[in-house]
Amino acid sequence: TEVLVQTVVHELDSGADCRVLDLCAGSGCIGLAAAANLPNARVLLGELDDEALKICRQNIRRNDLTGRVVSLQLDAREKPPTHLGEFDCIVSNPPYIPDGDIAGLDVSVRDYEPHLALKGGADGLDFYRDITRLWTAALRVGGRLLFEVGIGQADEVLRIMRSVGFGDLEITPDLNGIPR
């Protein structure tokens, strides 16, 4: 996730006004870190889960970013509301664990993380398909769609993105050298 934040900051001009959407925001850490490093960015934390949204709002206040960061209940698997407008960057670390793998997760994850934040469909790629297909319409011309992907999913996510017309794609390894 650190590398994803670095990529967002690198892709956007730190001095320019820009709009960033952190979709499937969870606690909001990606969007909040982007806002902290991009002083002219306006960031929307989009999250479906009510409890996660409460945490997003607390984190916005704790980080003193209430003037530039807002949170909103959004479903990444549905078409974006038109009133949101367009974004320079949509970033997402969506649920990517195949549904059948949930039972085998470490207890510290399986029993304490909301399954809504983990379950990515039969192959773990449902959110990538939906976000790429539906949310591209909310990107400005030349905008960036950035994902964190599960281990072993990078090539398939690239294929999904190419299938809707994305070019100039790259995979960045995480701090352990794993394509994410």
Predicted regions and their residues:
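Mobile active-site "lid"/loop adjacent to the S-adenosyl-L-methionine
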Residues: Y96-D126
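Conserved Class I SAM-dependent methyltransferase catalytic core
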Residues: A122-R180
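Conserved SAM/SAH cofactor-binding pocket of Class I
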Residues: E2-G104
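Class I S-adenosylmethionine-dependent transferase superfamily signal
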Residues: V8, A34, V109, I131-W135
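Alpha/beta-hydrolase-fold catalytic nucleophile elbow
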Residues: N93, Y112, E148
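Structural signal for short hydrophobic segments within the conserved structured cores
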Residues: V70-L72, L116, E170
